[in-house]
Regions:
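Terminal helix/beta-alpha structural elements that buttress the NAD(P)+-binding lobe
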Residues: 1-176
């Protein structure tokens, strides 16, 4: 992925989606990210063009994109996300999901973790290894951020799970 790419990130305001946005922006790609309107300002701060998910998503993405979408990262796993992805990108090797792993082969797309029945290839393992030092470098420079949510004592772990299930923004931190 690079400056000639337009990446669509489904669930761009989630933790993994935010990471995908930041990496793609660092590599020079144009990024369009789906999220609820309440999260659009945050996506703009990360360098993405936000679009609301829901009815009409395909048209909104096409309207927002400066050129054709060339790559898709699916962190949502919804039927809408898959359908829009398949409509936008002909090269199925450039569509990846972390959520619909068991279904990926039936769509002809890539699965990364997320229940994929296929282990990571050597190339994919190399990508992960290559990403770690780059991530540390970006974190150290302040060019990569991880959104933190509430900090709770370990004794409130059950409450932390409730917050995760309620989709509270940011990573919840449990402390001893």
């Amino acid at each position: 992925m690079g400056p000639d790419d337009v990446l669509l990130v489904h669930a761009g305001s989630g933790a993994v989606g935010q990471a995908a946005v930041q990496f793609a922006v660092a590599w020079g790609a144009t990024v369009i990210a789906t999220a609820s309107p309440s999260r659009h300002a945050q996506l703009r701060e990360l360098g993405a063009i936000p679009v609301a998910y829901g009815d009409g998503l395909l048209e909104r993405v096409r309207d927002a994109a400066p050129s054709d979408v060339t790559v898709v990262f699916d962190g949502a796993g919804t039927d809408e996300a898959i359908e829009v992805s398949l409509a936008l990108v002909a090269d199925r090797d450039r569509i990846g999901t972390i959520v619909r792993g068991p279904d990926a082969a039936s769509f002809g797309i890539r699965a990364f973790s997320g229940g994929s029945p296929v282990p990571l290839t050597d190339e994919e393992q190399a990508w992960r290894a290559e990403a770690l030092p780059k991530t540390i470098e970006l974190l150290a420079s302040g060019d990569f951020v991880i959104e933190l949510g509430p900090e709770l004592p370990l004794a409130e772990a059950a409450r932390a799970h409730e917050l995760v299930e309620a989709h509270v923004a940011g990573k919840i931190v449990l402390v001893p």
